[in-house]
Amino acid sequence: MRGSNPEIDNQAECLGQKFAQLFDAAPRIFQAPGRVNLIGEHTDYNDGFVMPAAIDFCTRVAIAPRHDRKLVVRSENFAEQREFNLDAFPDKGSGHWSDYVIGVAKTLSFSGSTPIGANLLIEGDVPQGAGLSSSASLEVAVGYALLDVAGEAIDLTKLALLCQKAENEFVGARCGIMDQFISSHGQNGHALLLDCRSLEYRPLPLGDEARLVIC
C-alpha cells in the first residue's frame, strides 16, 4: 500500500533492528497490506468485478542476501525458523506457515526469475483466518523482497499472478486473483475496481471522510 503511516513505519524500523541483531546485517524492508472487499464477494474466481481496498494491517519482511543457495526464514509471529535449499524445492506444501514463502520462491524460479540465497525475518499484524488475506499479504511481501534482493525488475501484476499461482499449486488453496492483486496494487485512501478477467483496474478515491470499519 502506497502512503505513509507513522505506526507502520515504526514497526518496520523495529523489525530492521531485530534483523540486525539476529543476522548481523543491515536489511531492506518490504511490506504488503491485507485487504477488505467492498463489492463482489466470490466473483474473483469467476472472472467478475471486485472492489477491494488495502488496510493498514500488513506483513513486513526484512531481507538481506546470503553467500549460498539457502533461504533462512524466521517468523516473529510463530517464533520459529526454517531453512530451504533453492536448488531442491519440495513438490508441494506440508501445511506449515513457511509453505507460503517457499511456494513463492519456487514459483518465481520456475517462471524465469533467479532468487538468490537470503535471510528473511517476517512479522505481520493481519489477523489470520479473519478473511483479511494474511496469506496474500505474506506472499506479495516475500515475492517483492526476493525479486528486489536479486536485482530483478518487478512487475506488480506479474507478481500478483505468480503469488496466486504459488497459493494455488504449492500451498493447495484455490483462491482467485483479488487478494494478491490488491496487496500488490493497493493505494492509500483508495479502493480498487478490478476486472478479474482482463485484470484491468482503476483506483477509486474513498474521500477524506470515508472510514472502513472491520468488525
Roles of regions detected by a PLM:
Residues 2-29, 57-162:
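Anion-binding (especially nucleotide phosphate/pyrophosphate-binding) glycine-rich loop
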Residues 28-32, 83, 211-215:
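Short amphipathic
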Residues 34, 59, 69, 116-118, ...:
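Structural beta-strand/beta-sheet cores of well-ordered domains, especially the beta-sheet scaffolds
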Residues 42, 54-55:
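N-terminal cofactor/phosphate-binding cores enriched in small/glycine residues
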Residues 46, 152-215:
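ATP-dependent small-molecule kinase catalytic core of the GHMP/sugar-kinase superfamily
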Residues 46-47, 129:
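Short, solvent-exposed loop/turn segments at secondary-structure junctions
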Residues 47-54:
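Short Gly/aromatic-enriched secondary-structure transition segments
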